[in-house]
């Protein structure tokens, strides 16, 4: 399965405005993965200076097909509103549950799958356990989870991902 990121032209230049033809071209590029059932979620990650524009969001979302999973990462806090969550939920599109040292998105589920981007510089053992509990709860509820750790400077992200994989495969410890 391949998770893809929407082209920067859509997220940082056009910012969903007048983007019909480029969106169509981008989606066409995903077609081989889609028809082979190897396409995972597609992430739209918007720049940190892009402020909320509900009219633009309302015009753009219908351009995206229902048979592909989409996640939206809004890095400007103005987007973190019930109005945005409702629009995403109405189309079964995920709010990317992103964490960084600069911004933490509320843990609002808007789709039948979870999409996590965990980009803090460090995660304690307790923090990683909490992440595993959240992911396990999604899986136990019949939802899929896509989880990505920061992977730039050292191997910790990959090690944490493997630790998470092992943790969710094992049953949770019994409570006393």
PLM regions with names:
Residues 1-176:
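Residues lining hydrophobic/aromatic ligand-binding pockets adjacent to catalytic sites
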